Amino acid sequence: MSRRELLGHGAAMTGGLLALGLFAGQASAAVRSVSTSTPRTRLAKAAERLLQETSPDFLVDHCHRSVELASLIVAAGNIALDEEVLFVGVLLHDLGLTQRFHSSEVRFEVASANAARDLALDYGLSAARAANVWDVAALHATGGISDFKSTETAVGSDAIGRDVVGYGLDGFDPDVVARIMETRAGFAEPFVQAIVADLQDKPQVASSTWMTTIAAKYIPGFHQNDIEQRALADPWENP
């Protein structure tokens, strides 16, 4: 399902919206806070514990908001998907920015996805569902790709992006959005600095990605790979 299709379903809603089925208390018509809800599955509970144990507050809040925005998108479009996969992939999509899951070799999205998939497998998810968790986390910042993967991946990327840059929220109940976004103020600066910290020992992974401008601004000596020049300089280009 492409993001265009998802957005096409995102008309304004009346009344409250139910949170994802992973949460208790669905009899209430109000969207419940992730931080105070109790997930129904062992994996969902473990994912919440892992997030809380490893992540600073600004990332915990961002991941909670992203899950709740995903629930709005799902409810608005009456979208059928694997709620547990969506929940775990979105909740853990930034683990790679934490000290525990930092990798000196791969992008933080991949480190996050690896950790999320490992947790999913440890709690009994099938290889296919765990691979989908990996996609949700790894591809969350690649809208042009995630749109054409699973529905869970498309919804997750859409929700996470809405929290980071604030687009596409005017189609939802403004009171619900205001409650979800109460913790959003002051997120951007520590988020950017977390990316900078993660890139210090692997600045090259930012080249030709959405992190390029951050690396160029904050990391001395960062050099953006020029794919055009490298392709033209390939010795096989002019044998």
Write out the residue ranges for each language-model feature.
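Active-site flanking loop/helix segments enriched in acidic
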Residues: A44-H62, L95-R100
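Divalent metal-dependent phosphate-bond-processing catalytic cores, especially two-metal-ion Mg2+/Mn2+ enzymes
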Residues: G8-A19, T54-V60, H64-I79, L125, ...
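Short alpha-helical hairpin
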Residues: A30-E48
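N-terminal twin-arginine translocation
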Residues: M1-E5, G15-V31
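Acidic/histidine metal-binding catalytic segments
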Residues: A80-E84, G124-V136
